[in-house]
Amino acid sequence: MFMGEFEHSLDSKGRLIIPSKFRDQLDSNFVVTRGLDGCLFVYPLSEWRLVEEKLSQLPSNKKNNRAFVRFMFADAVQCDFDKQGRIIIPKKLRLHAELQKECVLVGVSNRVEIWNKARWEETIEETEENFDDIAENLIDFGL
């Protein structure tokens, strides 16, 4: 399970250090793809296969389903680490998440999210402002 928040810098070649706590769980191969809310999702290969299986079961006769599957797969890349524990994030994915020098990596249960630091701070601030309403909705799920 991924959890925690880490700040790292993206270098000029699009390389980002992945914290050792996350590297250990990602193994040697994993998938990086566009995520929701303007971040990137990073899945261990085993978890990506589960996502892939669920997405393949969506009825393809619905336009929104087709669009979402395209969104998740079109720019997905299988990655590995270099000797320094970095990954190269392709330009198209960096543009999607508006990644600049300062990045935040967040563990979110079955995946890691990579955020532009400023966008992450805005997202957290908004979540904190609405936390009571969010929590109230989750009570229905037994949380």
Curated annotation (Swiss-Prot):
Q: Subcellular localization, per the record?
A: Cytoplasm, Nucleoid
Under the GO molecular function aspect, what terms does this record hold?
DNA-binding transcription factor activity; transcription cis-regulatory region binding
The alphabetized list of GO BP terms reads: negative regulation of DNA-templated transcription initiation
Gene3D superfamilies, alphabetically?
A: Transcriptional regulator MraZ domain
Q: Which domain of life is it from?
A: Bacteria
Major localization listed first in the record, in broad terms:
cytoplasm
Q: Which InterPro entries match?
A: MraZ, MraZ_C, MraZ_dom, MraZ_N, MraZ_sf, SpoVT-AbrB_dom, SpoVT-AbrB_sf
Q: Which UniProt keywords apply?
A: Cytoplasm, DNA-binding, Repeat, Transcription, Transcription regulation
GO cellular component annotations, sorted alphabetically?
Answer: cytoplasm; nucleoid
All copies of the SpoVT-AbrB domain together span 5-47, 76-119
| Subunit-structure text | Forms oligomers.
Q: Which family does it belong to?
A: Belongs to the MraZ family.
Tell me what this protein is called. Transcriptional regulator MraZ
Q: Which organism does this sequence originate in?
A: Pediococcus pentosaceus (strain ATCC 25745 / CCUG 21536 / LMG 10740 / 183-1w)
From which lineage does this chain's organism come? Answer: Bacteria, Bacillati, Bacillota, Bacilli, Lactobacillales
- Gene label: mraZ
